[in-house]
A protein has these predicted regions:
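Transmembrane-helix signature of polytopic, membrane-embedded enzymes
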Residues: 1-14, 225-228
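Membrane-interface transmembrane helices that cradle and orient dolichyl/undecaprenyl
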Residues: 3, 38-56
Length: 422
């Protein structure tokens, strides 16, 4: 029905997670477009007329080279669906599926040979950055539940899932089963990731919005007013998504000592209490669009555009790439600091502001102390917050407004004697 398609499209274009992906991480957003396109070409397989496998094959190859994990999940769901409804497919069309699969596998084979090694390297990198990451098999159900949690909060409120069994949806069992199978299989495959981020299941966003649009339509099939009211509530607030979690949040806050026994449980507790909060991401998103966002590095870049000179050297203890590209300064790495040639500028905003330093940064701290002791530097405090991480396209940690902090960035300028910065 066209009205269901309209509802699904409206939910998608007003979805803040999807909008953030399309604006700031288009490679993450590509599966949002490719998934419904792939399923559209797949459904034509069940038509009685002669099936053309070329569109499905082309989209599948493109999809694999874009996001192979989500592609694997969608393909797995499609294969399960095809097995369940194989009786509806003609023998001639079914035989063409094998050829399409062989061509896709052949063109994707170069990547398939290196993926196991690549996944191991990625896993090693993440585990080296944090001791809280679970590398055992138990992470699979944990990650699956986490995907359900994030999806419930921002995409599809699972309190409405029982309405998929409405009598009006019985004729749509073929389509509903395809959408559900692909969603579950994407969640399952994505659980292999080291960290369960919503971006790893972005392919499910259009599928879940189609299911949600079906529920909205058939739940109030005879009342457009109630349909509009439900759509407005889903778009403008997270009340339906989060309200069922509020009692659980209140209980968790009263029993917080049970959840703070380990670092992992503590992080899970803080994430749950932060996310289970009534708010309007849609309103916050428009607040972001109507206010200029000032990142933690913006003021620093503007400062050196005015005061920095070409050829001057600079050491910054975090995110040096930004100044290397956007300023005239010559950047110095921490290991290259020496006493005979002190940098013209020193910026402390990240690693060296941390009271607990690792061995490498501790060595750099000793070098900086010696440089400050033997040279004359003027201290300048910029009206810029000390934030080591810039904004993120992940909705859970995205900042809709400019970050603030009581701690400011310290800039040190080497001078021959006492003088003021002009």
């Amino acid at each position: 029905r066209k009205i269901i398609a309209f509802f699904a499209a409206l939910l998608l274009v007003t979805s803040v997670p999807a909008l953030l992906y399309f604006r700031t991480a288009r490679y993450v957003a590509i599966p949002i477009l490719l998934t419904p396109l792939l399923l559209t070409f797949y459904i034509t397989l069940f038509d009685k007329e002669k099936w053309n496998p070329v569109p499905l094959t082309c989209v599948a190859i493109l999809y694999f080279h874009t996001m192979y994990v989500e592609f694997a999940g969608v393909i797995l769901g499609m294969l399960i669906h095809l097995f369940l409804y194989r009786g509806r497919v003609t023998k001639d069309n079914l035989s063409k599926v094998k050829g399409s699969a062989m061509i896709t596998a052949l063109l994707c084979r170069p990547w398939l040979t290196v993926l196991p090694t690549l996944m191991n390297r990625i896993s090693e990198f993440y585990t080296s950055t944090s001791s809280l990451l679970d590398t055992s098999w138990r992470r699979l159900p944990k990650h699956f539940i986490t995907f359900l949690f994030h999806t419930n909060n921002y995409i599809f409120p699972f309190i409405l899932a029982p309405f998929l069994f409405l009598s009006g949806l019985k004729p749509q069992r073929f389509q509903v089963s395809l959408l559900v199978l692909c969603t579950v299989s994407v969640f399952a495959i994505a659980s292999l990731h080291s960290i369960p981020l919503l971006q790893y299941v972005s392919a499910c966003i259009p599928l879940l919005f189609i299911l949600l649009a079906m529920i909205v339509y058939y739940l109030f099939e005879k009342s457009m007013v109630w349909q509009a009211a439900l759509m407005l509530t889903l778009i403008a607030s997270n009340f339906i998504h989060v309200a069922p979690l509020i009692p659980l949040k209140q209980w968790a806050e009263l029993s917080n000592e049970k959840f703070l026994t380990t670092g992992y449980r503590g992080d899970a507790y803080r994430t749950f209490t932060r996310e289970a909060e009534l708010k309007s991401e849609f309103y916050q998103y428009w607040q972001e669009l109507s206010h200029r966002y000032q990142g933690p590095l913006d003021e620093l870049v503007r400062f050196f555009e005015t005061h920095g000179k070409k050829g001057e050297s600079c050491y910054i203890d975090n995110e040096s790439e930004v100044l290397a590209v956007l300023s005239p300064l010559q950047m110095i790495h921490g290991e290259d600091l020496n006493f005979t040639s002190p940098p013209d500028w020193i910026v402390l905003r990240g690693n060296q502001r941390n009271p607990h330093l690792d061995a490498m940064n501790l060595r750099i701290r000793k070098k900086l102390d010696a440089i400050f002791f033997n040279n004359n530097y003027e201290k300048i405090v910029l009206n810029a917050p000390v934030k080591r991480i810039n904004n993120s396209y992940e909705i859970q940690i995205h900042r809709f407004r400019s970050p603030t902090s009581s701690k400011k960035v310290h800039v040190y300028r080497r001078i021959a004697g006492d003088s003021d910065l002009s």
